[in-house]
Amino acid sequence: MRYNCRYSHIDKKIYSMIICLSFLLYSNVVQANSYNTTNRHNLESLYKHDSNLIEADSIKNSPDIVTSHMLKYSVKDKNLSVFFEKDWISQEFKDKEVDIYALSAQEVCECPGKRYEAFGGITLTNSEKKEIKVPVNVWDKSKQQPPMFITVNKPKVTAQEVDIKVRKLLIKKYDIYNNREQKYSKGTVTLDLNSGKDIVFDLYYFGNGDFNSMLKIYSNNERIDSTQFHVDVSIS
């Protein structure tokens, strides 16, 4: 009887350990799901709503220079700080007329006026305006779908502008950030350049969970020839 009791005691300890481990695993899964749900919602809010979009033509930066890799602009009622990955990029646009097409979230601060931050999204102003249709090929779970199109109106366009316009289409047609069904959890937007280079964006890159970290993917301000690329999208 002692022999059986001793092993019964050990069995209880093992059982308790299994229960604890199961609880920890379950807690981690719940936390991960909650994290993903929040971030999917944030991505949808960021790309879906036009209130987050900064558009401006033929404007110059203000003389107020805070850092060498940032330029400040006044866009309607918004005080906008545009950050770049390298300071030489900001120097290219300093004191020149530029067009802006970028996403921005309002800075959280106790300060007068509305302050916003963006990352890249700038091209030199060009008087040559011409509507160009760019084809967007979509593979939905490896099945090719009818192509979509976005339009741009400049000879040079930023990769950010293209990505924003493509995501808006994907949200509208495929509901890619839907939290109820979560039909999709992986996806890429690939700008396939005729030069042979690809620019790839992860549709489900969350950064640190805040808007600015999600937008830093655009800080290199990559620009491309509007007539020399198409877009490939894969979602699953």
Curated annotation (Swiss-Prot):
Binds to major histocompatibility complex class II beta chain. It is found in: Secreted. Its main location: secreted. GO terms for cellular component: extracellular region. The lineage of its organism: Bacteria, Bacillati, Bacillota, Bacilli, Lactobacillales. Keywords: Secreted, Signal, Toxin, Virulence. Residues 1-32 form the signal peptide. One of its GO terms (molecular function) is toxin activity. It comes from Streptococcus pyogenes. Belongs to the staphylococcal/streptococcal toxin family. The keyword Flavoprotein does not apply. This is Exotoxin type H. Mitogenic for human peripheral blood lymphocytes.
